[in-house]
Curated annotation (Swiss-Prot):
InterPro entries: Fe_traffick_prot_YggX (IPR007457), Fe_traffick_prot_YggX_sf (IPR036766). Keywords: Iron. GO terms for cellular component: cytosol. This is Probable Fe(2+)-trafficking protein.
Length: 91
């Protein structure tokens, strides 16, 4: 049976994650208040960030940057800025 959470990103009730995907207290916070849909949106942004900024996940500074962007995106409603990226307009 799916578990529902009040998603901090979507600001509505939605299907929650199946298990904790990120370690520590932040991981618990994500598990308790981020939906599958919001997490999928973050993964898209994360992939773009890693590729465009050429981030190396072995570098602690790059991991910290990604974590900061994740918190800003999921909990503070801040859009991820990727230089040169222009979203395709929906028709």
């Amino acid at each position: 049976m799916a578990r529902n959470v009040f998603c901090a990103y979507l600001k509505q009730e939605a299907e929650g994650l199946d298990f904790q995907l990120y370690p520590g207290e932040l991981g618990k916070r994500i598990f308790d208040s981020i939906s599958k849909q919001a997490w999928a949106e973050w993964i898209k942004k994360q992939t773009m960030l890693v590729n465009e900024k050429k981030l190396n996940m072995m570098n602690p500074e790059h991991r910290q940057l990604l974590e900061t962007e994740m918190v800003n995106f999921l909990f503070e409603g801040k859009e991820v800025h990727i230089e040169g990226y222009v979203p395709v307009e929906s028709k």
